[in-house]
Amino acid sequence: MRFWSLFLLVVLLAVGGQLPAASGRKKGERAGACPPEDGPCVISVPDQCQEDSQCPSTMKCCFQACFRHCVPRILVKRGGCPEDQLQCLSPTEHLCNKDSDCSGKKRCCHTSCGRECRDPARG
């Protein structure tokens, strides 16, 4: 009986170590998100980081334009953005860049014409 208890414990520990974190983040990945990409690739330079642990504690390793580098992480609000069913006829400038630009529970969402603050999708 003692053998099977020990065996079961070892199996559970082995399997548990293979599961992703409860938050859905990879091991070593910091909370928060990367800011939206800031434009096209103009000049390619070597990556400055490969993962969040290589950045100061308030930053994340993010891909921006051509390479990965440490940038300030941004707050991500709960809920997803609603699906945009419209086709843009006249693109507008972005009304937000990140969730913290939006009031209350609203999220900064990509739409067919740009980014704007919207209530999160239900479901």
Swiss-Prot record:
Leader sequence segment: 1-24
Record-annotated disulphide pairs: 34-62, 41-66, 49-61, 55-70, 81-109, 88-113, 96-108, 102-117
GO terms of molecular function: serine-type endopeptidase inhibitor activity
Domain spans labelled WAP: 27-74, 75-121
Cross-referenced InterPro entries: Elafin-like_sf, WAP_dom
Keywords from the named record: Disulfide bond, Protease inhibitor, Repeat, Secreted, Serine protease inhibitor, Signal
One GO CC annotation: extracellular region
SUPFAM superfamilies named in the record: Elafin-like
One Pfam family named in its UniProt record: WAP
Intracellular or extracellular location(s): Secreted
Presence of keyword Cell membrane: no
PANTHER family: WAP FOUR-DISULFIDE CORE DOMAIN PROTEIN 8 (PTHR47769:SF1)
Stated role: Putative acid-stable proteinase inhibitor.
Name of the protein this chain belongs to: WAP four-disulfide core domain protein 5
Species of provenance: Lemur catta
